Regions:
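Residue-level detector of high-confidence beta-strand sites
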Residues: 7, 20, 33, 169-171, ...
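CN hydrolase (nitrilase-like) catalytic-core segments centered on the catalytic cysteine
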Residues: 1-5, 73-177
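A short C-terminal boundary segment appended to hydrolase-like catalytic domains
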Residues: 185-186
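Active-site catalytic loop in hydrolytic enzyme cores
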Residues: 12-123
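Conserved hydrophobic/aromatic positions in well-ordered beta-strands
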Residues: 22-24, 158, 178-180
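Short loop/turn motifs at secondary-structure junctions and domain boundaries
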Residues: 11-16, 148-152
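Flexible, acidic active-site loops/lids enriched in D/E/S/T/G that coordinate Mg2+ and/or position polar
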Residues: 4-7, 11-12
Length: 186
């Protein structure tokens, strides 16, 4: 069996919703969940109209494969969550993500943003001595408001070891299914 980390649109109460990562154990039970704390307010991202910041704090989730420090998307830009998870015994940091370029960004700016995204998460690995799995969406999503040409998600899912070394890098523009062995004893 496998442990699965997935995202969902969670209704906590009438009119109160969260972008939530759910961790499912090998037997299908829910091991835990994490509600996204940082809600972006950038062009073509409209999460602030749907989601409330999380209220569960930063706590690792115990599973049969280890203690997982799970955060969602934009949370990856802030070092505090990774550090708090590590200090509480997380053995692996996982970031399910949907991030990309706003359509009007120049190619050079697009690449700088993507590289910054990779660098900050590799920094979490190095600073905390933990492997990181960053899973990102790929493809295009039009802007329903018509204010921009939408978001081109930059893919580039990756896995890195505790020294920030790449164990796997996916392409920018295609969906892939890959199994990566991560040495949790390092």
């Amino acid at each position: 069996g496998v442990v699965i980390v997935t995202s969902r649109f969670e209704r906590r109460a009438a009119g109160l919703y969260h972008n939530t990562a759910v961790v499912m154990e090998k037997d299908g039970t829910i091991a835990g969940k994490y509600r996204k704390m940082h809600i972006p307010d950038d062009p073509a991202y409209y999460e602030k109209f749907y989601f409330t910041p999380g209220d569960l704090g930063f706590h690792p989730i115990d599973t049969s494969v280890g203690r997982l420090g799970v955060q969602v998307c934009w949370d990856q830009w802030y070092p505090e969550g990774a550090r708090l998870m590590a200090l509480q015994g997380a053995e692996l940091l996982i970031y399910p993500t949907a991030i990309g370029y706003e359509s009007s960004d120049l190619p050079e700016e697009q690449e700088r943003q993507r590289e910054a995204w990779t660098t900050v998460q590799r920094g979490h690995a190095v600073a905390n001595g933990l492997p990181v799995i960053a899973v990102n969406r790929t493809g295009h999503e039009p802007d329903p408001s018509g204010q921009t040409n939408g978001i081109q998600f930059w893919g580039s899912t990756f896995v890195c070891g505790p020294q920030g070394e790449f164990l796997y890098r996916a392409p920018k523009d295609e969906e892939v299914v890959e199994v990566i062995d991560v040495d949790m004893q390092r």
